[in-house]
Amino acid sequence: MIFVNNRSVSYFSYLKGCLASLLLVATAAIAQDPNATQQLEQEPGVVAKPSILTKRFESDRTALANAFAITQYQRNYILPFSHVTNPNSLGNEALTSDNVDNNEAKFQLSIKLPLYTQEDSVEGLYFGFTLTSFWQLYNSEVSKPFRETNYQPEVFYQWNTDIRLLGFDFNAIQLGFNHMSNGQSGIRSRSWNRVMLSTLFSDEDDVYYLKTWYRIPEDAKVDENDTSGDDNPDINHYYGRMEIGYGTRFDNWGVLIQLRNNLEWDKNRGSVGITFSYPISPRYEAVLEYFNGYGDSLIDYNRKQERIGVGVQLALF
């Protein structure tokens, strides 16, 4: 629950109100100018350039024509060095609060495969998989273990909206099911299931996304060592209930900002992530990544963290 003017309202009522307000603003804009979606293209001598995501989807469409190809989903990167302020040692039995290292490597692999797509289009049903690992690479005292690994298999449908409004291409809407787990058991187990809804839009220089989710409820654990039941009943209060992202490029530099929030006024929590990138080849980029907040990993979901790391990623956009 969240509280507004001392009145308790459900998260869904609040979210519905926000979406309704956005719809009213868009409707009013169209009502004032029924040709708003076509003004840019109709100006004499001006040719509308394709937006970032329009070009990205076209590249995906070309790649998916190859039956042996897979495509990038979320970011793919490796940070050989990162420093984190408050790492949780619980994820590996060899680690303790005394020997866990604040310096570690972090990497993420993320792919998607089409299960069904419309002819000559990227609209369709997809399977996605994202793996994120936190490796105590510099911790020779305990044989350099993996402190935590998170797995995210998901299935989602992507609709290509192809709507141009107020200078933006509203490129796609995605709806799907996401399972996130650290693959552990007992007191180390962390997992949750969500129904995810995302919208993606962009212009020539910028890309935006808005993502929200509904957590599928689970029964409470009778005992913390039970193999069934909710591993983390309060995860929404820390990890959040929605995420907003913005990316842009200037003078070859790329910037990606990601914000998560729990939408609770009384105990507001969330996170901010900022990634700076610079191309070192057409395929690879050097990156500097900064994170502050909750949900850096599942084992750390309720611990406030600050992390900074350097590494390399596959070009994102």
How should each PLM-predicted stretch be described?
Residues D33-E141, P145, T149-P153:
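Outer-membrane beta-barrel initiation region
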Residues T85-A94, D101, Y116-D251, L259, ...:
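Outer-membrane pore/translocation modules
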Residues E243-E289, Y294, L316:
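Long, repeat-rich segments with strong aromatic
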Residues M1-R61, F317:
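Cleavable N-terminal export/targeting peptides
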Residues K304-F317:
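Outer-membrane beta-barrel "beta-signal"
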Residues S297-N302:
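Short proline/glycine-enriched turn/loop segments at secondary-structure junctions
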